[in-house]
């Protein structure tokens, strides 16, 4: 019997609040981000799931989110694997810049293309396609085999690394994934079939606040 895959985007970070491109930079959660992570953990506790293993990125905002969730579900010592394959999209030269300042420097249209096109990367950075090119193989080799063995796996990561996974799981087109926004701290619970396709998906919270 196939297992369960739960995906959670980290809570709001300091740089989300300051409207900065974050990428592989490493700010922590805001007070609101901590609340969001705790709410996600509470939702999972009420759902009644117990995990076998967790995965997260090497960035503190995702790791902090995971810790708060695991505390809420009563599994603070759950085995956890941290890998940069699950890191946020690398924004390259945009990293650390205020989004309005970036628009002033490169023009609103160009920055919009970098942010919202599927395959055009910012200078020195990754496109969404590039992000998926490292996330998806990691999922196939490290995470999916555990789910197919019947394990319950939690992944706490980032907006774009998770969008790369959801694109394939939900069979979204390029246009569909570009329109997809994942709310911070809201768990998505996937039950997978033996052939690795999705049997069911349940969202434990409100995705309308996604950004």
UniProtKB/Swiss-Prot annotation:
Keywords: Gluconeogenesis, Glycolysis, Isomerase. GO terms for biological process: gluconeogenesis; glycolytic process. The keyword Transferase does not apply. It holds the Pfam family His_Phos_1. Substrate binds at residues 9-16, 22-23, 61, 88-91, 99, 115-116, 159-160. Coiled coil: none annotated. It comes from the Bacteria. Disulfide bonds: none annotated. Its EC number is 5.4.2.11. SMART domains: PGAM. The keyword Hydrolase does not apply. InterPro entries: His_Pase_superF_clade-1 (IPR013078), His_PPase_superfam (IPR029033), PG/BPGM_mutase_AS (IPR001345), Phosphogly_mut1 (IPR005952). Pathway: Carbohydrate degradation; glycolysis; pyruvate from D-glyceraldehyde 3-phosphate: step 3/5. It catalyses: (2R)-2-phosphoglycerate = (2R)-3-phosphoglycerate. GO terms for molecular function: phosphoglycerate mutase activity. The active site is at 10 (tele-phosphohistidine intermediate), 88 (proton donor/acceptor). The record marks 158 as: Transition state stabilizer. Catalyzes the interconversion of 2-phosphoglycerate and 3-phosphoglycerate. Homodimer. PANTHER family: PHOSPHOGLYCERATE MUTASE. Belongs to the phosphoglycerate mutase family. BPG-dependent PGAM subfamily. This is 2,3-bisphosphoglycerate-dependent phosphoglycerate mutase. The gene is gpmA.
């Amino acid at each position: 019997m196939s297992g369960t895959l739960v995906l959670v985007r980290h809570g709001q970070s300091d740089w989300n609040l300051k409207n900065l491109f974050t990428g592989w930079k490493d700010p922590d959660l805001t007070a609101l981000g901590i609340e969001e992570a705790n709410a996600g953990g509470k939702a999972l506790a009420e759902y009644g799931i117990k995990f076998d293993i967790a995965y997260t990125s090497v960035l503190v905002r995702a790791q902090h989110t995971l810790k708060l969730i695991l505390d809420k579900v009563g599994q603070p010592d759950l085995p956890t694997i941290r890998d940069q394959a699950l890191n946020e999209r690398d924004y390259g030269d945009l990293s650390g810049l205020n989004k309005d300042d970036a628009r002033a420097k490169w023009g609103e249209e160009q920055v919009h293309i970098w942010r919202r096109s599927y395959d055009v990367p910012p200078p020195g950075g990754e496109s969404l396609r590039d992000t998926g090119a490292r996330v998806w193989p990691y999922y196939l080799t490290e995470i999916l085999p555990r789910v197919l063995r019947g394990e319950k796996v939690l992944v706490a990561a980032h907006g774009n690394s998770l969008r790369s996974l959801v694109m394939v799981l939900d069979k979204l087109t390029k246009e569909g994934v570009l329109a997809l926004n994942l709310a911070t701290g809201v768990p998505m619970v996937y039950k997978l079939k033996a052939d690795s396709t999705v049997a069911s998906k349940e969202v434990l919270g409100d995705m309308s606040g996604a950004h």
